[in-house]
């Protein structure tokens, strides 16, 4: 894990969190970092009050949009998700910089060993600084006699590097 935590983010605010692979306690010699995976988890904390909230649907919260962007050197990815009222919601951002179709096919016909390595080995490109931006667009629309308040959201994040182990065996 590159990092994880919880942030309370105000409406229309973007926070920036930085991570570095130098802070990872590696459990193996494998440093072939070929991607990054971010999981953002959030719920709805909109409140409503007033006599009109008893009307069907009047106290229903409006979905908020949570956007995450992860960046490492020239590699980046952005994904948005929305909370859906009760319970928690989440979405994932996955950025990879290796030939995953070659890896998952398990077959590299008509390729030399060095060509295969060029497609699967990051050659250190995954080491170093990573940045995660999280933005919240909180929505709260008042109904007749039912006032809604939604100024921020609590967002949990988990950032993991994707390691690739592979072995090249002649056919």
Predicted regions located by residue number:
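C-terminal edge strands of extracellular/lumenal beta-sandwich accessory domains
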Residues: 57, 119-171
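Hydrophobic transmembrane signal anchors and adjacent membrane-proximal interface regions, especially
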Residues: 7, 91-95, 102-106, 118, ...
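Intrinsically disordered, low-complexity regions
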Residues: 14-16, 21-23, 63, 113, ...
């Amino acid at each position: 894990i590159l990092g994880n935590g919880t942030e309370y983010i105000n409406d229309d605010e973007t926070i920036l969190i930085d991570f570095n692979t130098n802070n990872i306690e590696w459990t193996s010699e494998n440093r072939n970092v070929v991607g990054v995976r971010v999981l953002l988890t959030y719920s709805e904390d909109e409140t409503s009050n007033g006599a009109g909230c008893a009307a069907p649907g009047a106290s229903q919260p409006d979905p908020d949009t949570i956007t995450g962007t992860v960046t490492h050197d020239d590699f980046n990815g952005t994904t948005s998700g929305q909370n859906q009222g009760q319970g928690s919601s989440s979405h994932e951002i996955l950025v990879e910089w290796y030939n995953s179709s070659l890896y998952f096919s398990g077959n590299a016909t008509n390729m030399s060993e060095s060509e295969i390595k060029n497609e699967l080995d990051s050659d250190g490109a995954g080491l170093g600084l990573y940045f995660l931006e999280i933005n919240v667009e909180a929505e709260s629309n008042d109904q007749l006699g039912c006032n809604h308040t939604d100024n921020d959201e609590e967002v949990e994040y988990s950032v993991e590097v994707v390691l690739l182990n592979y072995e090249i065996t002649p056919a």
